[in-house]
Every structure is written in structure tokens, then in C-alpha cells.
A protein has these predicted regions:
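Secondary-structure boundary elements
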Residues: 1-60, 136, 148-166
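Hydrophobic/aromatic-rich core segments of domains that either
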Residues: 32, 64-151
Length: 166
């Protein structure tokens, strides 16, 4: 799997768990750690790059940041999932992580808390979820084949409208 923890990730998970309380404090710490440990660079990784490989490289794009955070969260016992969608104001798709934690109100319910390790922030307004899964391979935004002449071109557009939710 793309988020399998190697020895380096397991050591980092142990270190992070030792200094932060399980739950949101630990997820916040992991989010910040990934942001500080990686440099955003295009074309140094691909869709099959593992979390371990991206961390070893110390660089990648949003899906790599998300994979590293997922590997760390899971190694720390934090249930988490990969989110693919859009961040309003950015041109392309974006990836972030949701950590699923109990509500602590005794109901047995849980809530997904969004974390964006690419920007060292919590998700919120402006994050539009398209799909969730274990990692990128579960939620690839497109699949298929396009064949054309030498001058062919494939373009895509997106439009997002916000509506009131009651």
C-alpha cells in the first residue's frame, strides 16, 4: 500500500506520540511535522510513490504530503483517510487527510477532522471533498485513455458553486 510505514515512519510516529496527547493534539503535531519535513516540488514523485519514498526524498506534491501524514496517523493509532477534492482558489485538484475521532459526548459518534499537511493547516471553508479512500489509488480523479493525433489536446474545466446546507 502507498501508506505502509517503514522504520523511519515508525520511529517518527513513536517520537510524535511521546510528545502529544492522542487525538487532535497528536493529529495537529503530525500535520505540522509533515509540513516541516517536506518541500513542495512538482515532478519528483508519481501516483505510485509511497509515503516512505516521499519522506525519504523529502519532497513531493499534496498527495505525497497526505500519504506521509496517513502513514504516521495510522502508525500512531489515529483512524484516518485520504481526501481528494478542490481547494478553492487553487487551479487543480488537491489532497488532504481526515482523522476520524470520537465526539467525546458519550454518544459513540465520531467526526472527521480535516488536516492539510501541504499548508500546515486544518481544513475548513474552501475545501470541497470529491472522494475519500485509504489512499490516492482509491480516489484517482480520472481514469481511462485518451488517444489523438499529434496535435490533439484534452482540456477539462471545473466549476464549484456553494449552496446553503441546513
Amino acid at each position: 500500500p502507498l501508506t505502509q510505514a517503514d522504520d523511519r515512519i515508525l520511529r517518527a510516529a513513536d517520537d510524535l506520540s511521546a510528545v502529544a496527547e492522542w487525538g487532535l493534539p497528536l493529529a495537529d503535531r503530525i500535520n505540522d511535522w509533515v509540513y516541516q519535513s517536506m518541500t513542495y516540488r512538482y515532478e519528483v514523485t508519481g501516483v505510485r510513490t509511497t509515503a516512505a519514498a516521499a519522506l525519504e526524498l523529502g519532497a513531493g506534491v499534496c498527495q505525497d504530503y497526505a500519504h506521509v501524514m496517513l502513514a504516521l496517523c495510522r502508525a500512531c493509532g489515529l483512524p484516518s483517510r485520504y481526501v481528494s477534492g478542490h481547494l478553492l482558489g487553487q487551479g487543480g485538484t488537491h489532497a488532504w487527510v481526515e482523522v476520524i475521532l470520537p465526539t467525546n459526548d458519550g454518544s459513540g459518534d465520531a467526526i472527521a477532522h480535516a488536516f492539510d499537511p501541504t499548508h500546515a493547516s486544518r481544513g475548513g471553508l474552501g475545501y470541497v471533498t470529491v472522494a475519500v479512500g485509504a489512499d490516492y489509488s482509491d480516489v484517482a480523479p480520472t481514469s481511462g485513455t485518451y488517444v489523438s493525433g499529434a496535435r490533439g489536446r484534452l482540456t477539462a474545466t471545473k466549476r464549484v458553486s456553494l449552496v446553503a446546507v441546513e
